Amino acid sequence: MRSARVGDFDHDRFQQRYKGVRVENGIYTVVSKENTIELMMGEFYQVPENFNSSPKLSESEALSKTLKHIGAKKYIWESVEREAALKRKKNDPNASYFPKGELLVYEHSLGKSNTKKEFRLAYKFGIASIDPPISRYVYVDSNSGEILSSKDARRYEAGGGDTIPTTPPTPPDTNYGICFPDQTPCIKQGSASTRFSGVKTITTYTAGEENHYELKDYSRGKGIITYSWEFIEDPFMGIYLLNVPIVDINNGWTKFEYHDDYNHDALLDAHWGIEMTYDYFKSVHNRLSYDGNDSKVVNNVHYFNIFVGNNAYWDPMTEEIYYIYCPHNSSTCKSLNLPIILDPTYEDFTSLDIVSHEFGHGINGDLAGFTYDPEPGALDEGFSDIWNVGVNNYVNKVLGMQKNIWLVGDETVPGGGMRSVSNPKSTTVMSPGPNTYYGGLWDSENNEAHTNSLVLSHWFYTLSKGKQGINDHWCEYNVSGINIEKAEKIAYAALYYLFPTSGYTSARTAAIYSAKALYGKFSSEVKSTIDAWDAIGVPADTTSRGGQGMYKPHYYITFVKLSNLERSSGNDCGYKDNSYLHPTVIKGFTYNMVLSSEGEVSIPSKVHKWRVWIDFNRNGSFESSEMVVQDSINDTFGGTLQKSIQIPTSALTGDTRMRVSMKAVQSGESYQLANESFTEGEVEDYSITINNFSI
């Protein structure tokens, strides 16, 4: 699918296919360094060998069933204006919103439990309509015509999901006149009195006319376009909604002109906000627009929907941002008498927090393509909040502003903000949430993405600033902060590893490998990244650990010494990734290894059983011949072992893995396996460097 390089690591992304047919969400990423595979992660589906890949229905027949299911009065491709605008946007005379079905292998959930699943050959359609406003992905069984799934395509700022059907139309751009968008004389710098951020410099477009400046910035990529949705009164059609470009006569967008009952100054925030977000990703991450191809970004401000008030979303079908807000002082909005749209809790939805968050969804979708299942959806929202922090930090540094970088939506919700990244459980925000994976306030019932996303954004805060304490699973942590500038690079690079069905454990793995690629695998940045994930309780992707699940064991490793390695620790809650530590040993040499553990009183008493493996042949697995320690401490309170180990002359040189495992069991129970997890005890993983002897 694509290849990319992060630091010294190469990333090759592959799409699973069955007999040439794409398997939905079957994405795999292979990470390598100097032609040696370091990591493979993704989703691989075991499609039955006898699966029939020949459809009975044609694409047009499947589309007919899809449209019958949607039942819209007018679809987006039936709008001449929308089709013309798309052709201009894509610079392609053949571009169209008319849905094209893709035949694919789809894993279909049977029943509401989602536990029983089967594979179906299905057509996938992206459907957008104007009346009613809908934007959905629909999966149709290619044999029976059954609608397997119909999912909302958009990513919302708050709430959202399948209960909110909205997709607005966008009329065509105004006439460019004698001036083309890419000509510098048409591009001007204006002064804008924004609603939330003070007076700011914005880039506008003259259209080749005098006294004519539009909110169109063609100095950044293929353009940033900002429209205002206005209530238009027509003697024949009555009042209807239309989006129009706002024109200023002197490029001085003043508070006197635009701070009115319809909040026209909010358009200036959206326009400036996307400009700053574009600049952030270009300067910090070397990324051009949301898709890396410098594509046009379109703002639709004050879009109205009677089903939902006060929100914003990124629409992946139209690739535009919509800000749903009916200005509370507008006579038209008041006349509608709908409490949902006149909720005094909210200010306008074009603050920099919201703008950067929604733009971030476009980036998340392009790189990882998260589904909106519970954990992928939470990651999508969490990464967008991370970009919100990054953009606010960027304008604070570049423009000397004082944005509150750790509070999401504090300008849109002046009473305390929507979410707190630094203190997710804060009772002063609109939506408190968890600071620990499956901890207090984790939403297990509804799996609300914005709520559970706070675990990811709080990981980012913890990594950036550092933090010490005890999480909701009673696990102690002490994280050294590495600053926002390093943390945001790790977060961005992690998206190259992730895939549509990624969960929190995958995000942990991706971030750790990103830190290794960017700062070196034995760096302090890697240690902090690991410690931050431990702090928020996201478990490592390991085959062996103590304290199964979220259970904190009462028996744990306290000391490991080998060669130049000495590590003392407390209770690490069953598993500790110490791969940033790497004792150095010499082939053929013998070393004294010291191992200590602690435990509690137990009836019957426990025996601390120890095993240590070193992957001498570097094949990625621990074999029985690679076990270098096996012994027990016959004291329930623990103690210390000293063992002599020899590094074989046949060992391969270079960096490899070492696993230290202590299992607390009753006397007579068997020793643990290298890939075994257990209730009481702990596993620690290390790197180890094997060298040849030299004088």
Put a short name on every predicted segment.
Residues 38-39, 60-64, 68, 275, ...:
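Solvent-exposed, polar/charged alpha-helical surfaces in well-ordered, non-transmembrane soluble domains
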Residues 434-526:
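Pan-zinc metallopeptidase signature
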Residues 40, 150, 365, 625-627, ...:
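Residue-level detector of high-confidence beta-strand sites
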Residues 97-135, 142-455, 462, 471, ...:
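Extracellular zinc-dependent metalloprotease catalytic-domain scaffold
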Residues 1-166, 293-316, 695:
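Segments that shape or occlude catalytic/ligand-binding pockets
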Residues 506-547, 695:
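Beta/coil-rich, acidic/histidine-enriched accessory regions frequently appended to metallopeptidases
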Residues 540-695:
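A broad "non-catalytic interaction surface" signal
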